[in-house]
A protein has these predicted regions:
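Alpha-helical transmembrane segments of multi-pass inner-membrane proteins
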Residues: 3, 29, 60, 138-141, ...
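Interfacial loop-to-transmembrane-helix boundary motif in multi-pass membrane proteins
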Residues: 75, 122-136, 151, 164, ...
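N-terminal hydrophobic segments of proteins, predominantly signal-anchor/transmembrane helices
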Residues: 65-167, 445-446
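A membrane-periplasm/extracellular boundary helix in multi-pass inner-membrane enzymes
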Residues: 11-12, 199, 204-209, 283-285, ...
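Hydrophobic transmembrane alpha-helices and their immediate junctions
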Residues: 295-299, 401-446
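Long extracytoplasmic/lumenal interhelical loops at the membrane interface
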Residues: 215, 330-404, 420-427
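Transmembrane alpha-helices of multi-pass inner-membrane enzymes
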Residues: 298, 437-446, 453-498, 502, ...
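Membrane-interface helix-loop-helix junctions at transmembrane boundaries of multi-pass membrane enzymes
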Residues: 71-73, 113-129, 257-273, 307-312, ...
Length: 512
């Protein structure tokens, strides 16, 4: 975090205490010795397991060294890499772990350990609900498994610890990226990787030779190749719903930056290009839920923008243009959903996938949930289910942790929504755009997750938790420290145009 300078009455400048001050235990002499010995041992053991393992270990040590020297680079890496690769299969390159999990478990944890003791962002209600949600998901699920004497397999462990990786990602971003400039760079890094994701989805939809097979191998799924209906792109994700949820956030964030004129993140044409490309890729998923959600979110942002008429006309024209361009694909999907014959068509006027979900909930999951509302059934699948996918975030939460987990989820979403609403008029354009994006995402997710599992799958949750971290700490935290310095020294605040010299003495003795 950049230092805040103040001017004393005698004209001298000093540096005020900041969140970057203090010693972290990983920067002590003993910690360096421990790290050197541990890194050497890790590389040596990896070398005995094979060349690929040794190279991976060496790269891991190099990344750790870079993060130790420049923690902000580690945070940028998490922001730029984790969301777009969250759908890749496990084993790239660490066995049994996905690339995003490896990055969060290494860089994310390391960033939290590097945080200055006593100077990390203060915990808000959202943080407490979030850690409570992560702990409850793991604790209640493990208790359910132990009560049935069921083993905790790797699959169950992944579900138990999944929310914890989201919390680590959130706190690592919040703790490390503390300045406006850092948050602007992070927003840029969050959007730019969506370009190759969108291009891969479009090329996959066009059946460009080699692309479908490449993505099938990278995600360990054949769903695009084996789908018998209309072609639905999955991109670098295992399912089109995951891709749709990721692009849904990209579109909302990009439009929010545009209407808030956040040109410091990217030029208007670049932002518009990213949004249009993501919109086209979103349509290739042929998933009505994220497409409808993005449409509503963009229109809401346009209605609140200034000048309103110009933005409404622009967004409406773009929506109409994309709808006309992809009308044949959307029409085919519409016919699939609304021309179902009995017994597939149970309730008139509802699409077939809604009818199917209602049937699954009423016949498969509700009988199980009625007996396990207090603590849930657990992360594993109940026996004797003919269809094991819950098809709803709320059903998933009730199944994994019962009403307590659902309550904690509602608490973290509500507290973040209130904070985002309060910051939707923030003077900083980027922070305002993030706040508006989060508020819209939370409101729309209430309805969208009735029939989707966005909050626990790949794509959406990683973008969501990164944006929560980029919302930043309370702005009153730094003025309090600066105010304390001013009160203690009788200093005056620097003029807006003043620039501090390159090196100044610290108020505290012995530090420069």
């Amino acid at each position: 975090m950049s230092a805040s300078t103040v001017r004393l009455r005698d004209g001298r400048r000093v540096r005020a205490s900041s969140a970057a001050d203090g010693r972290a235990w990983l920067r002590t002499g003993w910690s360096r010795v421990i790290f050197t010995v541990g890194a050497s041992a890790a590389v040596g053991i990896a070398a005995g397991l094979g060349t690929k393992t040794a190279v991976a270990a060496l790269l891991g040590v190099a990344v750790i060294v870079i993060v130790l020297v420049r923690p902000v680079i580690g945070a940028y890496t998490l922001v730029a890499v984790v969301p777009p690769v969250s759908g890749l299969r496990a084993g790239l390159p660490v066995p049994q772990l996905r690339p995003g999990e490896v990055l969060i478990a290494s860089i994310g944890v390391l960033l939290l350990l590097l945080a200055r003791p006593g100077r990390t962002p203060r915990w808000r209600a959202f943080d407490w609900f979030a850690i409570g949600y992560a702990v409850a998901n793991a604790g209640l699920g493990a208790a359910d498994l132990l009560s049935r004497s069921s083993p905790i397999t790797l699959s169950e462990a992944d579900k138990l610890l999944g929310p914890m990786q989201f919390f680590i990602l959130y706190r690592a971003v919040l703790t490390t990226l503390t300045t406006e400039r850092q948050r602007r760079i992070a927003l840029r890094l969050l959007l730019v990787p969506s370009v190759p994701v969108s291009l891969l989805a479009i090329l996959q939809e066009m059946h460009v030779p080699g692309i479908p097979a490449l993505l099938a191998n990278a995600t360990d799924t054949q769903i695009f190749l084996t789908n018998s209906g209309v072609a639905r792109a999955t991109g670098p994700f295992a399912h089109w719903q995951d891709l749709g949820s990721y692009l849904f956030v990209v579109v909302i964030l990009g439009v929010s930056l545009l209407v808030n004129q956040s040109w410091r993140v990217a030029k208007p044409r670049i932002l518009a290009g990213i949004v249009v490309l993501a919109g086209i890729a979103l349509i290739t998923t042929v998933s009505f839920t994220p497409i409808a959600g993005a449409t509503v979110g963009v229109l809401v942002l346009a209605m609140t923008a200034r000048p309103r008429k110009r933005w409404v006309v622009r967004t409406a024209a773009l929506i109409v243009l994309l709808s006309v361009a992809f009308a044949p694909v959307l029409a085919t999907r519409y016919q699939e959903q609304f021309t179902g014959q009995p017994p597939a068509k149970q309730i008139p006027y509802l699409p077939e996938n809604f009818n199917f979900r209602i049937t699954v909930w009423t016949t498969e999951f509700i009988p199980v949930l009625q007996e396990h509302l207090a603590t849930g059934y657990g992360p594993d699948d109940p026996p004797n289910l003919s269809f094991t996918y819950t098809e709803s975030a709320y059903v998933t939460l009730l199944l994994r942790g019962g009403l307590p987990l659902l309550f904690l989820y509602a608490g973290l979403m509500l507290t973040l929504a209130f904070r985002a609403r309060d910051l939707s008029d923030d003077p900083d354009a980027e922070r305002r755009a993030v706040a508006q994006t989060l508020f819209i995402l939370i409101v729309l997710a209430v309805f969208m997750q009735l029939t989707t599992n966005y909050f626990v799958n790949a794509g959406f949750p990683f973008m969501f938790w990164v944006l929560a971290g980029l919302l930043g700490d309370d702005r009153t935290a730094r003025p309090r420290r600066l105010g304390a310095v001013l009160a203690a020294t009788g200093a005056q605040r620097p003029a807006p145009g003043d620039r501090p010299p390159g090196r100044q003495s610290d108020l505290r003795r012995g530090r420069q």
